[in-house]
Amino acid sequence: MKWLQIHITVDQDQVDFTETLLMSLGAVSVTLDDAEDQALLEPLPGETPLWNKVIVTGIYQEDDNDPIDVEKLKAFLQAQLPNIPMRHEQLEDQVWERAWMDYYDPIQIGEKFWIVPEWLEPPEADATNIKLDPGLAFGTGNHASTFLCLQWLGKTDLKDKVVIDYGCGSGILAVAALLLGAQKVYATDIDPQAVLATKQNAELNNVLERLYVGLPEEFNTEFKASGSQADVLVANILASPLMMLAPEFATLIKPQGEFALAGIIEEQVDDVSEVYQQYFDILNIEKREENWCRISGKRHSQA
């Protein structure tokens, strides 16, 4: 099986349209990358943590018996995005799996974190450097929801705290919490590949001994066996499962424990907040690029 990558370099205000366009044409995934080697610094109020120039990459799966007409696809894209630079490349499976290593650079998240590919040296040795090899699991710091969660963790007192990372993906949030002093992190994801990636990334950062990660059923058994409740919970998934999980999260977090939810777009904030207000005090709603939002607050004093 082969893969086709279409790389389109656009301005910040064209990202949403370009991403939607690529997905509507059958892309199996879309990624965003810095086009001009800019640091992703902590934004001022009203600003967004997205680069001015962005490479939007659509990934298409090619069937050997029905190959994609690349020129026809590019012609259509160029009609929708006139005078916009774009290029394509076709990758075999083995090359595609690690192709991003050729151009992946450290990413600065605010002023506290650097996300550093495992094969590169950290740009700032004294910063909180998260070594990462996400493979195909979600969560590299590029996406707005991951940024919002990292930003929140960086401002939260995690010293000697018990933390839950629900929907851990690559493990980036679990690792960040441990590097910031969490006593223990319990992480879970429905994807076995994410569980493996989280273990590998925790090992890369020398924090594996303070991490438990498993599929949800395994996680539930392990966490209940611990006899504790979490001081902090972070969940970067989607609005629908977040609303379904609200009663369960209320049992996992101790009274006055802190939480942050992401993977929510602006239009979903009211619905999610309404469900969570039954169990939690909503203290802050933070909005970032392309309408992605974070809801944070504390568990009610009485369980």
From Swiss-Prot:
Keyword Protein biosynthesis part of the UniProt annotation: no
Subcellular locations according to the entry: Cytoplasm
GO cellular component: cytosol
Listed CDD domains: AdoMet_MTases (cd02440)
GO molecular-function terms, A-Z: protein-lysine N-methyltransferase activity
Gene3D superfamilies named in the record: Vaccinia Virus protein VP39 (3.40.50.150)
Function of the molecule: Methylates ribosomal protein L11.
Leading EC class: transferase
Coiled-coil spans in chain: none
Main location, first listed in the record: cytoplasm
Domain of life assignment: Bacteria
Protein name: Ribosomal protein L11 methyltransferase
Family membership noted in the UniProt record: Belongs to the methyltransferase superfamily. PrmA family.
Catalytic activities: L-lysyl-[protein] + 3 S-adenosyl-L-methionine = N(6),N(6),N(6)-trimethyl-L-lysyl-[protein] + 3 S-adenosyl-L-homocysteine + 3 H(+)
EC number of the protein: 2.1.1.-
Annotated GO biological process: methylation
